[in-house]
């Protein structure tokens, strides 16, 4: 199991880092007290999933050596690959971020009533043991949200860009538009196998439907055009820091034409090495009916 402990200065980007790790498939827990870390790790040992935990200044123990001892104990475990990811930023950057968001620093809330600058300085001192044990340190001073996300992804996975999952989904307009679609292609103008009595009971996954549709040049031309559209803009969409791209293809009932095109186009992108999911939402309704 890989365990990443995320910590850092308040306002340096811990929440962003945790969201990136969640997108990478990590089981994430925010603001776990250090004294519960061992018990938590023990409880998730069997889930067969990488884990990320954020440690906040508010839940650090009063004795700094307890942090070091806890992390040393976890690092000694043979079945745990421990990394400490520390998010840092310059005082000037943190002051600016707090000014822009108008949030209160966690250490300014206590009885000491510290100024923002004093709180930042104190936090830096209190987090020193974690910095010393960090295997990954990221300075977010000059990063925007997307740049920081890419840095975290690169440091953790060795690649900057998130691998986009392309979802190709067929549907029937009579059942309504899919709510999660990024792009919708209406293919109701194509020749319809529904009007061939022998083909009507079949679906777009069956060979006789393939043969019928592939006799029509407009079907093959549209397939090429949809593939070309997605291929052309995929690099830009991948740079947009998104996890999913959903392409919906619809015909009247979602049984023949849209199913055929969705399946063929999805398989085309699978063969190119992309992460692809193929769904036939309306086809499931026909089968249930």
From Swiss-Prot:
UniProt: ATP binding residues: 8-15
Signal peptide span: none
Source species, domain of life: Bacteria
MF annotations from Gene Ontology: ATP binding; GTP binding
Pfam families xref list: PapZ_C, RapZ-like_N
Record: residues binding GTP: 56-59
Keywords assigned: ATP-binding, GTP-binding, Nucleotide-binding
Protein's job: Displays ATPase and GTPase activities.
HAMAP family, per the entry: RapZ_like
Family: Belongs to the RapZ-like family.
Protein's name in the database: Nucleotide-binding protein VS_2760
Source organism of the structure: Vibrio atlanticus (strain LGP32)
